[in-house]
Design a protein with these regions (language model features):
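Short, conserved DNA-binding cores of transcription-related domains
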Residues: 1-101
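Active-site phosphate-binding and catalytic loops of NTP-dependent enzymes
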Residues: 50-63, 153-165, 177-182, 359, ...
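RNase H-like nuclease fold core
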Residues: 86-91, 98-104, 137-138, 146-238, ...
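Short, amphipathic alpha-helical "recognition" segments used to contact nucleic acids or chromatin
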Residues: 109-121
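DNA-recognition alpha helix
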Residues: 125-136
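Conserved beta-strand -> loop -> alpha-helix junction used to position metal-binding or nucleic-acid-contacting
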Residues: 235-242, 247-283
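Acidic/histidine-rich catalytic cores and adjacent linkers
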Residues: 286-412
Length: 412
């Protein structure tokens, strides 16, 4: 329907009658609320006319079997505050508006705004204060919980959605959240899987919580991925997760396990005093940036000569995990960066930390999952295809062409 600007101006003029001088922000909000009320009520009257099949006072309504029967007030909450709408009724009680459903109490966009604030990490109290300050609307903690609980249905659908048959790389990482339990606050790990599919597209495959971590837990996670359609994974990048090697060997026996270089660096710097962190990080870089595995071994020896007496624990960490830290040396430089430079993991961690920082702790693991899902949904919408992925595809074709074809064929 085309908007008649002349009629709109007339509506504005009528609404502003008796208002001397320029409008301030508060007056403009009141005016917009009045106009919104008129727009909704006009649309509702139009719905009733459509259902009855005749205009008000039209003789066609005589002996039609139904007629208009006044209005009833309905209080709605929206971005402009509280609106009391006069909803038209019919005598038979058959009229059920589509614009505003029978039991609806919030206007379109109200819930989305609340969920958006929740996703940014705002607490229930912050959301209440925001709606009161901006819109003059009181929202109860129960309402906020009701609205955000609707997100769990989306979480369940997302967590069970079908996945791609083949993932070239899957990163498994853990996020730490604080959960209130029996009057105490406990650290709980939420495990996240990020996959790069055969077309070079990144996605978060799922979230899982567990009080304990081991082969049984990880086998359950990997079995879930298989049940959702994953046929094969070429490389799995992990952070020394307990029980994972046994689980991956059972679920995806041909997958290559690569310990995450970023996490190895982070674990190394955990031992270093603040003043020397930059220098130590710079001296670790030649190890994982070496051209070959033997050269990397020489660089580790050089690092040990310089820092071993003070930070022998770092040298031990790299030596004891050497076999799972170095598989990426089998691949060319352009593919190595994709494997060990886990930008997707780091960007996800950064986004999630911002969201949970203001929350303090969560009343349950489910509440944490809601917030993590919303933060992830907003982030992944911005992710692009991996740069230089065509070269990576060609390399994977050389080393695992039969596996790739088999997985893609099974998923077709």
């Amino acid at each position: 329907m085309k908007l008649d600007l002349n009629n709109f101006d007339q509506l504005m003029d009528e609404a502003m009658k008796g208002r001397p001088g320029p409008l301030d922000e508060a007056s403009a909000t009141v005016l917009m609320r009045q106009m919104m009320k008129r727009i909704y009520e006009r649309a509702l009257r139009g719905e009733l006319t459509h259902q009855l099949g005749y205009e008000k006072h039209d003789v066609a309504g005589h002996r039609s079997g139904n007629s208009r029967n006044g209005t009833s007030p309905k209080t709605m909450k929206g971005e402009l505050g509280t609106l009391v709408l006069d909803v038209p009724r019919d005598r038979n009680g058959d009229f059920e508006p589509q614009l505003i459903a029978k039991h609806q109490t919030r206007l379109l966009g109200f819930d989305d705004k609340m969920i958006s604030m929740y996703a940014r990490g705002m607490s229930t109290r912050d959301i209440q204060a925001h709606f009161q300050e901006m819109y003059g609307v009181e929202v109860s903690p129960g309402l906020i919980s009701e609205v955000t609980n609707e997100v769990m249905e989306a979480v369940k659908a997302w967590q069970s959605r079908p996945l791609e048959p083949l993932y070239a790389i899957v990163y498994l990482d853990a996020l730490i959240v604080k959960i209130r339990h029996d009057g105490r606050v406990e650290n709980r790990a939420v495990f996240v899987a990020i996959g790069i599919d055969w077309d070079g597209k990144k996605d978060v495959l799922g979230l899982w919580t567990s009080a304990t971590e081991g082969a049984k837990f990880w086998l359950g996670v990997l079995t879930e991925l298989k049940n959702r359609g994953v046929k094969d994974i070429l490389i799995v990048c992990v952070d020394g997760l307990k029980g994972f090697p046994q689980a991956i060997e059972t679920a995806f026996p041909q997958a290559q396990v690569q310990c995450c270089i970023v996490h190895a660096i982070r674990a190394s710097l955990h031992y270093v005093n603040w003043k020397e962190r930059r220098a130590v990080a710079a001296d670790l870089k030649p190890i994982y940036r070496a051209a070959t595995e033997p050269q990397a071994r020489l660089e580790l020896e050089a690092f040990a000569s310089k820092w071993g007496s003070k930070y022998g624990s770092i040298v031990n960490l790299w030596n004891s995990n050497w076999e799972t830290l170095t598989p990426f040396f089998e691949y060319p430089e352009e593919l190595r960066k994709i494997i060990y430079t886990t930008n997707a993991v780091e960007s996800l961690n950064s986004t999630v930390r911002k969201s949970i920082r203001t929350r303090g702790s969560f009343p349950s693991a489910e509440a944490a999952l809601k917030l993590l899902y919303l933060a992830i949904r907003n982030l992944t919408a911005k992710w692009d295809t991996i740069q230089g992925w065509k070269d990576a595809m060609n390399r994977f074709r050389i080393t695992a062409g039969d596996r790739i074809d088999a997985a893609l064929a099974l998923g077709a």
